């Protein structure tokens, strides 16, 4: 009987307790809910001629004629309302290019939907990242649509890009996400096995 207890103790010692999230990422269902762009070549041409080509020739961010953000953390901070602006914004994203990490892209549609301001989310055509690299290493550009931005440019974006729609979130828009942890065990992998 004592021999069987020792073997049981050895089996237990080879496993350790861990906590795994029940939902790996609460935004995975919404990650594929990008609004449709009706005339993508036109939108891409407008963005290149009106914004990107001008930004390429400007040396520093302080000289930009518009308020815009290209860093992922700055964009998230802006969309969370930290800047206190209620002006509508356009967020252009290279979501079809492999250079942009999926972890960043999964959160974008829901962040835009939950933002306190009106956000027009615009997905750009494949290989747009080649042009975008000189402006943004993350393939994202958030442009505040205030008086400094051409009204015709903004109206074309508004007309050709659908609204974000998450009908199942309308009633619970400001309720926090509840992610639970599951208590389980995993085997302890020795360093000899890893090599």
From Swiss-Prot:
Nucleus among the record's keywords? yes
Keyword tRNA processing found: yes
GO BP of this protein:
intronic box C/D snoRNA processing; maturation of 5.8S rRNA; nuclear-transcribed mRNA catabolic process, RNase MRP-dependent; rRNA processing; tRNA 5'-leader removal; tRNA processing
UniProt keywords (A-Z) are: Nucleus, rRNA processing, tRNA processing
- Tell me which domain of life the UniProt entry assigns to the organism this sequence originates from: Eukaryota
Quaternary structure annotation from Swiss-Prot or TrEMBL: Component of nuclear RNase P and RNase MRP complexes. RNase P consists of an RNA moiety and at least 9 protein subunits including POP1, POP3, POP4, POP5, POP6, POP7, POP8, RPP1 and RPR2. RNase MRP complex consists of an RNA moiety and at least 10 protein subunits including POP1, POP3, POP4, POP5, POP6, POP7, POP8, RMP1, RPP1 and SNM1, many of which are shared with the RNase P complex.
Q: What family is this? A: Belongs to the POP3 family.
* Miscellaneous comment: Present with 1360 molecules/cell in log phase SD medium.
Report the function annotation for this chain: Required for processing of 5.8S rRNA (short form) at site A3 and for 5'- and 3'-processing of pre-tRNA.
Name of the protein described by the UniProt record: Ribonucleases P/MRP protein subunit POP3
Q: Which organism is it from?
A: Saccharomyces cerevisiae (strain ATCC 204508 / S288c)
What is the gene called?
POP3
């Amino acid at each position: 009987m004592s021999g069987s207890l020792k073997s049981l103790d050895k089996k237990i010692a080879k496993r350790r307790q861990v906590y795994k999230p029940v939902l790996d990422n609460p935004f995975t269902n919404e990650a594929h809910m990008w609004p449709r762009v009706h005339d993508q070549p036109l939108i891409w041409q407008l963005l290149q001629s009106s914004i990107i080509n001008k930004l390429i020739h400007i040396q520093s961010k302080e000289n930009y004629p518009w308020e815009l953000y290209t860093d992922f953390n700055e964009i998230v901070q802006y969309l969370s309302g930290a800047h206190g602006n209620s002006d509508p914004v356009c967020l252009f994203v290279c979501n079809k290019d492999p250079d942009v990490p999926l972890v960043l892209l999964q959160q974008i549609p829901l962040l835009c939907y939950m933002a306190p301001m009106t956000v027009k989310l615009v997905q750009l055509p494949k290989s747009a990242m080649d042009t975008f690299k000189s402006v943004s290493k993350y393939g994202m550009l958030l442009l505040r649509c205030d008086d400094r931005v051409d009204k015709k440019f903004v109206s074309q974006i508004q007309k050709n890009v659908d609204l974000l729609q998450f009908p199942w979130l309308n009633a619970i828009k400001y309720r926090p996400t509840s992610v639970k942890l599951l208590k389980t065990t995993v085997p302890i992998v020795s360093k000899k096995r890893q090599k």
